[in-house]
From Swiss-Prot:
Protein name, as recorded: Recombination protein RecR
Organism: Shewanella baltica (strain OS185)
Keywords: DNA damage, DNA recombination, DNA repair, Metal-binding, Zinc, Zinc-finger
Biological function: May play a role in DNA repair. It seems to be involved in an RecBC-independent recombinational process of DNA repair. It may act with RecF and RecO.
Matches recorded under PROSITE patterns: TOPRIM (PS50880)
Length: 199
């Protein structure tokens, strides 16, 4: 059944969100129209502002509405000689939530995937190479995902960093804290054994 054209457009627009199918989009639209129009207007305003004003940091490529994100603009962290390379801005938030990393970031906005047409240019690796060539980077921490594409991306970047004589490290992969061995997949378990540390 078709509703009004505006309602149909709202439902179809909500479907662009990950994990939102036709029924979920319809429920969201009805919720906003029937019970929470004020929140709907606030959502529309925030979405409009974010779409027009949020761009990428000129240094690390994470999301910001300024030229530099707060980390790169910080006098303490923006001059750190340690850069952590991640695939997405969400990875930055995850690492920041841990509160243990005090350096700066470089966000790839993806990973190498030749079949999908994603090469070094799409990941901004020319900008990363400029950072490495500047002489201001002592260590590059590779925190790409432990997938085939993430590993290939990490190896490509490691080769680039070696040319600039920058120390390279890779975040550890293994058994999660609180995890039980019987539920850990064999690849993760192998990585845990290969990356074991002395006590």
């Amino acid at each position: 059944m078709k509703f009004s054209p505006l309602l149909d457009e709202l439902i179809q627009s909500l479907r662009c969100l990950p994990g939102v199918g036709p029924k979920s989009a319809q429920r969201m639209a009805f919720q906003l129209l029937e019970r929470d129009r004020k929140a709907g207007l606030k959502l529309a305003s925030a979405l409009s502002s974010a779409m027009s004003d949020v761009g990428h940091c000129q240094s690390c490529r994470t999301y910001t509405e300024e030229t530099l994100c707060p980390i790169c603009a910080s006098h303490k962290r923006g001059t750190s000689s340690t850069i952590c390379v991640v695939e997405t801005p969400a990875d930055v938030l995850a690492i920041e939530a841990g509160g243990h990393f005090t350096g700066r970031y470089f966000v790839l906005l993806g990973h190498l995937s030749p079949l999908d047409g994603v090469g070094p240019e799409e990941l901004g690796l020319a900008l990363l190479e400029r950072h490495l060539a500047s002489g201001d980077v002592a260590e590059l921490i590779l925190a790409t995902n432990p997938t085939v594409e993430g590993e290939a991306t990490a190896h490509f970047i490691a080769d680039m960093a070696r040319r600039h004589k920058v120390m390279i490290s890779r975040i550890a992969h293994g058994v999660p804290v609180g995890g039980e061995l019987e539920y850990v997949d064999s690849t993760t378990l192998a990585l845990s054994f290969n990356g074991r540390l002395p006590l």
